């Protein structure tokens, strides 16, 4: 299928193929090449990835009050000459102030996590507890008489904690009643947030939303449990979408610059000879695509010891095929088969084919500038909504609230024209103040000493 994202179409491999084809590395390599063609190809222009990276870099400089002053100098230069100007070209930090106000205003957590068990067992316990408390309310006199005569307490809760009526009981159930499973669930969720430093992660996410208009995080599940990682939108790629929450994207990717020892740790099966060849090809790709204006200079040693790897997720579907066989006793037995299973349509056969399609996610790792696919496999621990187990959620959570027709707008992007006008006005005021300053007076001390006052004395510099 051809996915058109600009003037030139990008050819992605068809998804209407068998599961065996999708799991092959050739299919994964085709997906990798298509993504590289769509985002990193400079033949049709600057490339989507590089255009996005440069624009985000420009907005971040404005948000820090460190934007380029070249445009301001061009406004004041006369035929490119600035020698007659003595101005303070440092940008006025207008935008950083408002960015801090907006970001800090989004940091308050106004709500706490509250778990409410709805399973039949928990619901039964809650109902039984309410009935027991209601019984204590209705039999307060009898319970007190039993305590006085027999010295035995038959209450379900202490008398001081007993609600006075049904209204107080309802309020108590909302505020004071908690089952152990609910407390454990709340503690587990809070522990996930705490271990992943969620407040710092959220602040970076909100900062990107304000400055760039888009924010992204990635969730994974490994031996350390649930992990939430920050994703730089400048390194993020995605399939075309008009949804501000990116829920209909069928692929996401993240570009990472990793060292050779980290690559060897992630993929220990790569031979050292192949690793050396990858380094040479990868460094050439970096030298060609490096933006020396917007990126810190990278030494030749760094180029020879790092690789640019694209980690991506690809959403497709798989067919769960079962052979339903009728046994001699009349019962049915389900046997798992691959999607190539296609029995003949013969009523004399006592079995049939039953299939169900469900979404899956494939994980891949591709070295940019080469044809090397480091990883291509079906993801494990995929996230599925409890209401629809046939649907899968991507590992990336992305939001761009002000996106329209694929174009992302941020608060800072709307403020940059006004920041430029304020900066030009500031420079013009400096120029006007310099013109209003009177010219200095030069006093020739030697000439004053030669002035004859007519009384036998000469004029001196101290008297002047």
Model-flagged regions — what are they?
Residues 326-464:
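Extended, charged amphipathic alpha-helical segments
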Residues 1-357, 362:
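Extended, helix-rich architectural segments
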């Amino acid at each position: 299928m051809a996915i058109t994202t600009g003037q030139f179409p990008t050819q992605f491999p068809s998804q209407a193929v068998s599961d065996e084809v999708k799991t092959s590395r050739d299919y994964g390599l085709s997906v990798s090449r298509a993504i590289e063609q769509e985002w990193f190809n400079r033949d049709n222009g600057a490339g989507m990835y590089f255009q996005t990276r440069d624009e985000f870099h420009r907005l971040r400089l404005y948000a820090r009050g460190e934007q380029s002053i070249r445009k301001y100098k061009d406004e004041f230069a006369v035929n490119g000459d600035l020698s007659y100007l003595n101005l303070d070209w440092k940008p006025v930090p207008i935008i950083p102030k408002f960015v801090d106000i907006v970001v800090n205003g989004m940091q308050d957590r106004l709500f706490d996590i509250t778990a409410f068990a709805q399973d039949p067992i928990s619901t039964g316990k809650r109902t039984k507890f309410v009935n027991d408390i209601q019984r204590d309310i209705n039999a307060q006199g009898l319970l007190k008489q039993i305590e006085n005569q027999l010295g035995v307490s038959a209450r379900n809760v202490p008398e001081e904690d007993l609600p006075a009526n049904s209204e107080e009981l309802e309020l108590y159930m909302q505020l004071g009643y908690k089952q152990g499973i609910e407390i454990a669930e709340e503690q587990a969720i809070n522990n996930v947030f705490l271990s992943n430093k969620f407040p710092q992660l959220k602040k970076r996410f909100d900062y990107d939303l304000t400055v760039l208009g888009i924010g992204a995080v990635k969730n994974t599940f490994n031996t350390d449990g649930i992990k939430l990682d920050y994703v730089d939108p400048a390194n993020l790629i995605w399939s075309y979408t008009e949804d501000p929450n990116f829920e209909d994207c069928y692929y996401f990717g993240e570009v990472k610059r990793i060292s050779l020892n980290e690559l060897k740790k992630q993929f220990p099966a790569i031979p050292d000879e192949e690793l050396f060849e990858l380094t040479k090809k990868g460094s050439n790709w970096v030298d060609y695509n490096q933006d020396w204006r917007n990126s810190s200079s990278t030494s030749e040693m760094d180029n020879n010891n790092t690789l640019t790897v694209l980690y991506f997720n690809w959403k497709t579907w798989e067919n769960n095929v079962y052979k339903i066989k009728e046994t001699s006793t009349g019962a049915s037995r389900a046997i798992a088969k691959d999607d190539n299973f296609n029995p003949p349509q013969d009523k004399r056969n006592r079995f049939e084919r039953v299939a169900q399609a469900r979404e899956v996610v494939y994980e891949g790792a591709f070295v940019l500038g080469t044809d090397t696919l480091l990883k291509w496999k079906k993801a494990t621990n995929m996230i599925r909504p409890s209401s629809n187990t046939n649907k899968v959620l991507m590992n990336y959570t992305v939001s761009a609230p002000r996106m329209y027709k694929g174009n992302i707008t941020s608060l800072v992007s709307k403020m940059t024209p006004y920041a430029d006008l304020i900066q030009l006005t500031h420079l013009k005021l400096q120029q006007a103040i310099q013109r209003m300053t009177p010219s200095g007076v030069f006093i020739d001390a030697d000439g004053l000493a030669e002035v004859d006052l007519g009384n036998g004395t000469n004029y001196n510099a101290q008297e002047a």
